Amino acid sequence: MVAQPKVRTSARLPRGALDRETVVAAALDIADREGLGGVTMARVAEALGGSPMSLYRHLSDKQELLDAVADLAVSEIPAIVQDGRPWRVRLEEFALEVRRCALRHPALVEIVLATYVRGPAAASVGLDMIALLHEAGFDEDSSIRGFMALRNHIIGALAWEVSRFRGGGEEFAREVADNFVHEDTPADSPIRRLGDVVSEDPERQYMFGISHLLDGFEAELRR
C-alpha cells in the first residue's frame, strides 16, 4: 500500500519541496474531501501554497493530473495473492479489495467513467486479473474478454453504489422504486420489491454480480 501524504493547508512548501508525488497526493486528498469537481490546478496549487504555473513543471495538464490521481488510488489495491488457493476465491477477494479502494476514493469511479485510466497501477490490476483467468484455464482471448466483463460489472456496480450514497441511501432507494412502481403496478409484480433490493447491503449486490459472472466462467471451463 502506498502511503499518501495528506496536504490540507495552504502553508507554503519550502523551495524545491514541490514534486510530482506531492502534487498528485494533494489532488487525491482534495478529491476525497471535496469531490472530483474540486480538483483544479488552481485548487491544488492553493493547497500546496504555490501557484498554478508551478504545477505545470510536473504535469502537463489537468487530464494528466486526473490520470495520476486515479493511478495513485488504484495503487492501494493489493496484488492478487499467489498462494495456491482456488482462482475463484482469489478473484472474489480481489474484487472486494477493488470495492474498498473505490469507497475510500469515490472520485476514482468518476475518473474511470470519464476516461481510460492510464498508469502502471491501473495496468497492473488488469494484467493480474487476466493472468489469473489464464491460470484458471482460459485461453488468451477468453482471459481478456473475461477481464473486460468483470471490469464492466465492477465499474457499473461501484458507480451505482457511489451515487446511492450521495443520494442519501434509503431516500435514494425510495426514489428509484417510485420511478418504476405506480398505483397500477400489479400487487404480485416482482418490481414492487425493487426498493427493498436497492436498499439492501451494497456489498451483497456487488458480489451477486461477481458471483454470477464467475459461475458462467466456471461453466465455460467445464465445457
Residue ranges and their predicted role:
Residues T22, A26-E64, A68:
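Helix-turn-helix
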Residues T22, E64, E93, S124, ...:
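Amphipathic alpha-helical interaction segments
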Residues A79-A121, E140-S143, L150:
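Hydrophobic alpha-helical connector segments
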Residues E170-R223:
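A structured, mid-to-C-terminal "fold-capping" secondary-structure block
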